Amino acid sequence: MKVVLTKDVEGWGTIGDVIEVKKGFARNYLIPRGLALELTEENKRFIDNILAQKARKLQREKEKAFELAKKLNGVEIEIERPIGVTGKMYGSVTTSDITEKLKEKELEVDKKKIMLRSPIRNLGSYNIQVKLHPEVSATIKVHVVPESK
């Protein structure tokens, strides 16, 4: 029996694939669980339409990411932190701190997209990568400076 997959099925294929399976497997497993539909012209068009919508949505997300990357590239932010008598910084700079500073510049970025291996614990300048989309990233410069009294 030929079916068209409505979801990714491990070992069988991805959404939109037309596969040949035994009738029992299709009727008792794939179709009741919503993983596949019996192959008809109408069902094939339905799945193709869903795939086209998904592709358009992914393209729009990628375009938005490119626009934001253009704005973010070259942005420099300054974060002040208190330092002790020995010159060591109290606390650290995290992705949340960077996100807040970007918001002040009217740039909305989810903190999960900021690629920071570990919190910044020293004063200095750092180039930080912001991964906006699997294919789009930007680099911002973060200056960690002593807090002015």
From Swiss-Prot:
Statement: the UniProt record of this protein carries the keyword RNA-binding: yes
Domain of life the protein comes from: Bacteria
Q: Name one GO biological process term.
A: translation
Q: Does the keyword rRNA processing apply?
A: no
One example GO MF annotation: rRNA binding
Q: Which GO terms describe its cellular component?
A: ribonucleoprotein complex; ribosome
Question: Keywords, A to Z?
Answer: Ribonucleoprotein, Ribosomal protein, RNA-binding, rRNA-binding
Matching entries from PROSITE patterns are given as: RIBOSOMAL_L9
Instruction: State the protein's purpose.
Output: Binds to the 23S rRNA.
The similarity comment for this entry is: Belongs to the bacterial ribosomal protein bL9 family.
Q: What is this protein called?
A: Large ribosomal subunit protein bL9
Q: Which species is listed as the source?
A: Sulfurihydrogenibium sp. (strain YO3AOP1)
- Lineage of producing organism: Bacteria, Pseudomonadati, Aquificota, Aquificia, Aquificales
